[in-house]
Amino acid sequence: MELLARPLDELCAEARALRDEGHGHLVTYSPKVFIPLTKLCRDVCHYCTFAHPPRRGERAYMSIDEVLAVARVGAAAGCREALFTLGDKPELRYRVARDELEALGCETTLDYVARAAEAVLGETGLLPHLNPGVMTREDAARMRPVSASMGLMLETISDRLSARGGPHFGSPDKVPARRLETLAAAGEERVPFTTGILIGIGESRAERIEALLGIRELAERYGHVQEVIVQNFRAKPGTRMAAASEPPLEELLWTIAVARILLGPRAHLQAPPNLSYDDFPRLLDAGIDDWGGVSPVTIDHVNPEAPWPELDRLRRATESRGLELAPRLPVYPEWISGEWIDPRVMPAVLRASDSLGLAREDGWSPGEDVSIPFVPRDALPIDTRAELGEEEIARLFRARGHERDRVLAAADSLRREVCGDEVSYVVTRNIQYTNVCYFRCGFCAFSKGKLAANLRGAPYFVPHDEIVRRCQEAWERGATEVCLQGGIHPAFTGDYYLSVVRAIKEAVPGLHVHAFSALEIWQGAATLEVPLEDYLTELRDAGLSSLPGTAAEILDDEVRQVICPDKVTTAQWLQVHDVAHRVGLRSNVTMMFGHVEGPRNWARHLVRSREQQRSSGDFTEFVPLPFVHMEAPMWLRGQARSGPTFGETLLVHAIARLALHPWITNIQVSWVKLGAQGVAAALRAGVNDLGGTLMNESISRSAGAEHGQEFAPEAMEELIRSAGRIPRQRTTLYGDAPEERRLASFGAAPLAEPWNPPVKDARLVAPPRLVRPGFAT
């Protein structure tokens, strides 16, 4: 009880320090719609205007159509949460409720809550957060498959407030023991749960502390309490407590600060901003890290007299305390896992979330032809002179708002210092020689996507003479490079890759052959039963000039085991490139991000890339590849996010520039993934290279990307100049393209239609054993 005697300023200072320790500069809110499914209630709380008896001409429950109409408006406005708030068990008090439930085919209000929540989840993608009142363990289990989270305010631990004359007299569901039983039931059913206390209804400070300690004990026992709300009583006309005194702001601040001290730095602590009116920014001074649900489309039906502050005002108030505002989901990031989220809800949660488990802050996804949500703003760069370790890199990936602007500015400044204002690109042709593959990559729509128009198409295999024809055509159009990759056909051996290189070099000796990922190299060597060094040397002698850095995905095996378990491991990928560098073959390194991984995995990928470059020194560039989700199998199964947000995409390019300096100095952007507007923004975030003109591109298109298959030199240079930069046509190894090649690349003739004969015409025979390097470790 030492807390009772401490000065408010001292408590608030400690609470703020704890908040900053646990949550840094981040303050969240949940963009929501409020769905008052029924305003009938068997309880008669003396301060409540939400619940009322039946009214003539009014239905007891919203119809499903009405529920969906509200939810759809919210979804269109960018909401992520559908908050279901309702009276407690009205059917136990009112015949009209029982009759209406019977007509709806439901026995209880909870039955109807489940039906309405399921409709919202399935029809709109909004994530239901249910406040259905007191529940048993069986009730919680029934609600779990249709909700992302649930909640019930404990309100108070004091039984005396339920006695005659108290605000909860006549309200059986407000008995503290019953509400604590609901909190425990939710914990037993692994439900992410929100609870809290209501202050100013007659309880003492000591009773508030006792209530908070009761919440803490249940949180420690079950781990399910995701958020604690400290809500202040507001007197409302027409209630029995209309004349009651409201708690002063200092009392609310004291309670918030004490809650933070008792619950600790990692707890999520909320106070509703609308109930403090113009004083709401001061709530931050007491240690909250969340503003709760804020709706752009519906009122607060529980407190209709208190409108939510506009989002811009909320942001300004947050930033005035040196904090950053970010939208979240109704379920907090720490609870987004199979332990806490039902498999029927998880797909919607993943699709609504970003890499931190917060709400996607923009509607952008890689490959979509839509306007970019923002452009980098001028800002004072952060200091990045010291080499960044894994912890520092992971921390930078959490940057948002002004802090993100500073990261992007630092990357842009370093790019200017290292690369100047030139932006390079290479005239190349992509050739994917088959879309048949026996590996099981969950992200790949190229070999496993739907047979949709303009996407994967039918299985095919390109014969050598067609590969050679495309190379000759590319040479005539000014290309200096051909990039070859494809699926791993079960009949391929190392001899296949050798034969392709020899055929190309015999026909077009001046063309740089940039071909075969680490997976193809590993598989080729294994099928011939020769060491990697011998096989890579033979490829080099046949005419292979460099390796693409694809198949890297994320260089962290905890992610690879999920997305590509039979592919090369992290160590195997690094080994292939280490050996390639030793035999004189340069390569690049890629990173595919925005699916199941997060900032920690990105940081490990960058550190491992940097260490490999420090060791072998022959990576030419780093290429971030945002995950294109639309046709990816693991996204269609509900097992992946919808690609990175635009903010995350710019951060990956920028932090790659900062973290890889001075070892890898070229950072490339994929125009296929970002489109022209995205490329222009990336050029202000550390990027100095636009990659290849491609001529043909199938892999991103198979996944659903809408951007074109060729970015001609004329258009490439126009885009670069429009960004205030200087275009430079380069070779694969970053020399200047010969003038003869450059001249040939402008005004090139249209491409002939490529020939992709059906795979049945390939007449390849599979070997008796398939190489699966990921399963061999």
PLM regions: where:
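Active-site phosphate/pyrophosphate- and oxyanion-stabilizing loops and adjacent acidic/basic residues
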Residues: 16-17, 35, 118, 141, ...
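Conserved, mostly hydrophobic/aromatic
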Residues: 15, 45, 84, 152, ...
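Mobile, glycine- and charge-enriched loop segments
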Residues: 27, 31, 41, 47-55, ...
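Auxiliary Fe-S-binding modules of radical SAM enzymes
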Residues: 1-9, 20-22, 68, 75, ...
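Active-site beta-loop-alpha junctions enriched in small/polar residues
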Residues: 34-36, 87-89, 131-135, 155-157, ...
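Canonical Radical SAM [4Fe-4S] cluster-binding loop centered on the CxxxCxxC motif
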Residues: 27-66, 89-90, 413, 417, ...
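Conserved Radical SAM active-site core
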Residues: 54-220, 389, 448-604, 608-611
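Hydrophobic faces of well-ordered beta-strands that scaffold small-molecule active sites
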Residues: 27-33, 82-84, 128-130, 150-152, ...
